[in-house]
Amino acid sequence: MVLDGVLPVTASQEEVTFGQAVSFEASVKHFAADCVDSGECPFVGSAREVEQALRSFLAGLDDSPLPTASDRELTESLGQYAVLSFLYFPSSDYPRLRAALTEAVEEDDGTALLSLVDERVNRSPDGRYLDNSTEAFYAVTCADMPYNGTVDEVARLASQWQEVAPTFGEAFAWGMLSCVGWPQAAES
């Protein structure tokens, strides 16, 4: 038996999600340092400057999504997901993430970053999802750690978390609203 991500059973979704946001912020710092050291970073400057440039790039996608080779644009949320999902395995994922970011930053083309997202969510080129792992993740998370916060409560948390985890804190806080209303009682 393999236990992955064992958490205290008393941990709330808010506690777990905040912990993830802080941990991913540490991963962003690691990626930024690696990006500078690689000599193949699409952003210039120190690791701290690369972190800020990455955040600015992602935030800019909200107002100016990047075109891709498909009919889909690379939006801020898709850009964040691409970066987030490629922070797990530095030796194998960082080079691919750097290359995709380079294409986006230097060529204004979001195709490679969108491809990274599709890979992680098992979306085929024709738009079909090859499994329901994303839905299963939410179902299990929401059943294990229900969350019934309000939009106002999450807005307050998003603002606070943004201070501690400026790359993903706000998005992680808002993501908890996905669990409002879970678990849903079965109809008899």
PLM regions: where:
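Alpha/beta-hydrolase fold active-site neighborhood
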Residues: 51-187
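A catalytic-pocket lid/entrance helix-loop region that shapes and gates access to the active site
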Residues: 2-53, 99-115, 119-125
